[in-house]
Amino acid sequence: MPEAMTASPEKTPASDYERRQKLELNKLQKRLRREVGQAIADFSMIEAGDKVMCCLSGGKDSYAMLDILLNLQKSAPVRFELIAVNLDQKQPGFPEHVLPDYLESMGIEYHIIEKDTYSIVKEKVPEGKTTCGLCSRLRRGILYNFAEEHGVTKIALGHHRDDLLETLFLNMFYGGKLKSMPPVLHSDDGRNTVIRPLAYAREKDIARYASLREFPIIPCNLCGSQENLQRQVIKEMFQTWDKQHPGRLETMFRALCNVEPSHLADPELYDFREGRRLGGKRQAVQTAEPQQDFGRLDVLNL
């Protein structure tokens, strides 16, 4: 009697799509793990016994940073602690439940700091003027004070490679400075050390990773400020370059890591008479008094 033939179930379009999604997610996670791990090693970002505070805004970058650091923590050669912190600035319409619900599901220690900096910014900044400078200084001042009070040794921010390049061009175009965001920034008084674990990661990879991981993204509705508009112009320029000239952004980023002071024109970095390098000005997180009374909030320039 012939054996009964059983037909194997055909793959449905949905299951094939899910398989491709899973493969893409695994590939992206490996790439981001590698890039974050390399940045941590290259710049000595995290050391044994560190307490790392991941600053979460609810955007794709900070979600991805926390996710990758939690992943790396499991297999890291050194033991370090991770906590997540969000500053609720009391922006109208900010969904207060989203981050706590997500962080509860992740099982990580977290803190939500409630400070109404939104009202301060609206009160102090004239209509039509950029809010970014004051808003970021107030935000960082609060976060840095919190870090010191809670024994945090490293403050992790979610800036990625594209942010570093955009900041370089913003400073060149509008500030007359050859200046970007460093992967690690130490304060002069030793209070704070800021790290940027995503320094090697591309924004488009982070955006796709966040989409595949289905992070509960919270949009920022506070500003349509001039600084953000200027940054958007540069971002669009980079996107055009990336399409028309693949590899250009990678080469530009390598230039940030390969500076030759003798071929620039800054006498603070190079003694052109003696033909030797100088120490230059040390850039760091500096505590500064606000120009106006903003209450008991320290303003830190970064």
From Swiss-Prot:
It is an enzyme of class 2 (transferase). One of its GO terms (molecular function) is 4 iron, 4 sulfur cluster binding. It catalyses: cytidine(32) in tRNA + S-sulfanyl-L-cysteinyl-[cysteine desulfurase] + AH2 + ATP = 2-thiocytidine(32) in tRNA + L-cysteinyl-[cysteine desulfurase] + A + AMP + diphosphate + H(+). The keyword rRNA-binding does not apply. One of its GO terms (cellular component) is cytoplasm. InterPro entries: Rossmann-like_a/b/a_fold (IPR014729), TilS/TtcA_N (IPR011063), tRNA_Cyd_32_2_STrfase (IPR012089), tRNA_thiolation_TtcA_Ctu1 (IPR035107). SUPFAM superfamilies: Adenine nucleotide alpha hydrolases-like. Binds 1 [4Fe-4S] cluster per subunit. The cluster is chelated by three Cys residues, the fourth Fe has a free coordination site that may bind a sulfur atom transferred from the persulfide of IscS. GO terms for biological process: tRNA thio-modification. Its cofactor is Mg(2+); [4Fe-4S] cluster. Catalyzes the ATP-dependent 2-thiolation of cytidine in position 32 of tRNA, to form 2-thiocytidine (s(2)C32). The sulfur atoms are provided by the cysteine/cysteine desulfurase (IscS) system. Homodimer. The thiolation reaction likely consists of two steps: a first activation step by ATP to form an adenylated intermediate of the target base of tRNA, and a second nucleophilic substitution step of the sulfur (S) atom supplied by the hydrosulfide attached to the Fe-S cluster. This is tRNA-cytidine(32) 2-sulfurtransferase. The gene is ttcA.
